[in-house]
Amino acid sequence: MINISGHILPIKNIVDMAHAKGVEVMVDGAHTVGHLNFKIPELGCDYFGSSLHKWLSVPLGAGLLYVKKDKVSKINPFFSDGDRETDDIRRLNHIGTHPVHTDLTILDSINYYQTIGAERKEDRMRFLQKYWSEQVREYPGIILNTPKESWRSCGIANVGVEGIQPSVLAKRLLDEYNIWTVAINGPVYGCRITPNIYTTTEELDQFVKALKEIADS
């Protein structure tokens, strides 16, 4: 998934094409874990990295690293745990001194996610994005930079207003409507909108109203 627009890429197809040429694949899945219903091994990639604070709601500072078992021994990180065998993936997690309370939240976050259900959460995220984006996709002056097809996007979308720089749009949304967004200034131009499962349709109605008022001004 592309973070600035929410596009879902056909990773399995890309991995297969790369492997056919003898190329190993590392996937940046920062916005997928806790967002999309999938299993990393099904992608076929050699390496996969993700943030856990984005959609799994773990505190800042926690991440995920997946390495195919036969690839672990070939990796030589700058910092590593020298007490582990070369084929032990735990040597790639050089902890040092850090806030251990973050690690202690990971299991609770996973349990909460599993209680909701991966499929239910993905469906909810896609519903929320469609709820607001379909109300403005054809509205004069508003530009949607995210695909309409459900299989090509989920919770994230990128929206802009003609003639208004993303940073200006983000500032107006915050200052005038108390709505916080992320300004994206290329390669697509707009604001990234990222509701979560607790976002209400009433809140999205306020956002749609704000976008339309700005587009009309």
Task: Locate the predicted segments by residue.
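Pyridoxal 5′-phosphate
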Residues: 1-217
